[in-house]
C-alpha cells in the first residue's frame, strides 16, 4: 500500500529545480502556474546560484512556487504505482496532496496558496519584535520520548514561543520571538546533554508560522477557503463506520480528512496557526492504515530526512 509525501516551505526549490527545466512537462506546468499567479517562477530558478547565501524569496513567492514545483515533478516523473492510497503533505505540502489526490484543481490550489501566503505575510508584519522558526534536532540515533518531553517542558517557561512542528522523536520546530528562540537553544543544549548532541537550524521563512502569531491571518484565509471548491467524489473516498474520508492525512489531527468541504476548510484554516503533527501523520498512515511504500516528491530532501527519522525509507522520483 503506497503513500506520497510532499514538502513544505523552507526547501531550496530554486537550485533543486534547475536540472529539470529542460523537461517539457516541468516547463509547461511551471508556465501554467505562472499564468495563474503572475510569478516568474522559472526566472527565479534560472537565476539561482548554487550554494548561494542569499535568502529564499519571500513567502508570497516561495509558497506558490514550491507547490508548482512539486506538481511539476509529479507530472513529469509519474510513480511506478498507478495510484497512491494515501497523500501526506507537510504544512504547505498539504495543498500539493490535495492536488495530487484530485480533490483540488491545480489552479484553485495556486490561488488558495497565494492567498494563504499573503495572509501569513500580513500576520508576520504585525509582530512588534522579530519572529522566526527554529528546528531543534537531537543528533543521537536512538529516538527517545524524553527529548520531546524535555522540549515541551522547556517551552512552557518561555512566554513567547510555541510548538510549530513535531516531525519525529528527534526533531521539533519552534516558532516565536527570535530572542527567546536564541535563549531556549542554549537552555535545551544543557537539558538534553545526557541524551545526545543538539543541532539547531533557523528556517528560512519570514515569520513564526504555525503559532499564535498567525492568528491575524485567520479572516483573510477563511474568506479564500470559503471561495474554494473541493472535489469530493465517491471514488476518492474511504468509508469507515458509515463515515466517508479522503485519502489525505491532516496535519492538525493526524487522521484522514473527513469527506466534507466545511471540515476541510476548517482544518486548513487551523493548520495555519496550529502545530504540524507530522510524526503522528506518518505513524497513522503506516501503523493504522498499513502503508509500506513511501514516495517523496517535490524539491529538496526534507521529506526523505524526516521519514528516515521516523524509521521510514522512501523512494524518490526523480
Swiss-Prot record:
Domain of life, per lineage? Eukaryota
The record's section on InterPro entries has:
Ac_transferase_dom_sf, Acyl_transferase_dom, Acyl_Trfase/lysoPLipase, Mal-CoA-ACP_Trans/PKS_FabD, Malonyl_transacylase_ACP-bd
Q: Catalyses which reaction?
A: holo-[ACP] + malonyl-CoA = malonyl-[ACP] + CoA
Q: Where this protein primarily resides, as one coarse class?
A: mitochondrion
Q: Fetch the SUPFAM superfamilies from UniProt.
A: FabD/lysophospholipase-like, Probable ACP-binding domain of malonyl-CoA ACP transacylase
**Record pathway:** Lipid metabolism; fatty acid biosynthesis
Enzyme Commission number(s) from the entry? 2.3.1.39
Q: Which positions carry the signal peptide feature in this UniProt record?
A: none
One short Pfam name that applies is Acyl_transf_1
* Molecular functions (GO terms): [acyl-carrier-protein] S-malonyltransferase activity
For this chain, the annotated S-S bridges are: none
Q: Name one GO cellular component term.
A: mitochondrion
Which keywords, in A-to-Z order, does the entry hold?
A: Acyltransferase, Fatty acid biosynthesis, Fatty acid metabolism, Lipid biosynthesis, Lipid metabolism, Mitochondrion, Transferase, Transit peptide
Which BP terms in the Gene Ontology apply to this protein? fatty acid biosynthetic process
Intracellular or extracellular location(s):
Mitochondrion
Q: Which family does it belong to?
A: Belongs to the FabD family.
Its annotated function is as follows: Involved in biosynthesis of fatty acids in mitochondria.
Record-given protein name? Malonyl CoA-acyl carrier protein transacylase, mitochondrial
Amino acid at each position: 500500500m503506497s503513500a506520497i509525501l510532499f514538502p513544505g516551505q523552507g526547501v531550496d526549490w530554486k537550485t533543486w529545480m534547475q536540472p529539470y527545466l529542460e523537461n517539457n512537462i516541468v516547463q509547461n506546468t511551471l508556465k501554467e502556474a505562472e499564468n495563474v499567479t503572475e510569478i516568474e517562477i522559472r526566472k527565479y530558478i534560472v537565476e539561482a546560484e548554487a550554494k548561494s547565501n542569499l535568502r529564499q524569496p519571500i513567502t508570497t513567492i516561495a509558497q506558490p512556487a514550491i507547490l508548482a514545483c512539486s506538481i511539476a515533478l509529479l507530472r513529469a516523473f509519474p510513480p511506478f504505482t498507478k495510484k497512491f492510497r494515501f497523500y501526506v503533505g507537510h504544512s504547505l505540502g498539504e495543498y500539493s496532496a490535495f492536488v495530487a489526490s484530485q480533490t483540488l484543481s491545480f489552479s484553485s490550489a495556486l490561488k488558495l496558496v497565494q492567498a494563504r501566503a499573503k495572509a501569513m505575510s500580513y500576520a508576520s508584519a504585525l509582530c512588534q519584535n522579530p519572529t522566526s522558526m527554529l528546528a531543534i534536532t537531537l543528533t543521537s540515533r536512538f529516538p527517545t520520548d524524553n527529548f520531546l518531553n524535555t522540549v515541551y517542558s522547556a517551552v512552557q517557561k518561555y512566554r513567547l514561543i510555541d510548538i510549530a512542528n513535531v516531525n519525529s522523536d528527534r526533531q521539533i520546530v519552534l516558532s516565536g520571538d527570535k530572542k527567546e528562540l536564541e535563549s531556549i537553544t542554549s537552555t535545551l543544549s544543557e537539558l538534553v546533554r545526557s541524551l545526545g548532541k543538539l543541532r539547531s537550524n533557523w528556517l528560512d521563512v519570514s515569520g513564526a508560522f504555525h503559532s499564535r502569531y498567525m492568528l491575524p491571518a485567520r479572516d483573510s484565509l477563511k474568506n479564500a477557503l470559503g471561495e474554494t471548491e473541493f472535489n469530493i467524489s465517491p471514488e476518492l473516498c474511504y468509508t469507515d463506520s458509515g463515515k466517508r474520508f479522503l485519502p489525505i492525512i491532516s496535519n492538525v489531527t493526524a487522521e484522514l480528512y473527513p469527506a466534507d468541504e466545511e471540515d476541510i476548510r476548517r482544518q486548513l484554516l487551523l493548520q495555519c496557526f496550529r502545530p504540524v503533527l507530522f510524526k503522528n501523520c506518518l505513524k497513522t498512515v503506516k501503523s493504522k492504515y498499513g502503508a509500506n511504500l513511501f514516495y517523496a516528491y517535490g524539491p529538496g530532501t526534507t521529506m526523505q530526512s524526516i521519514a528516515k527519522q521516523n524509521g521510514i525509507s522512501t523512494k524518490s522520483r526523480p
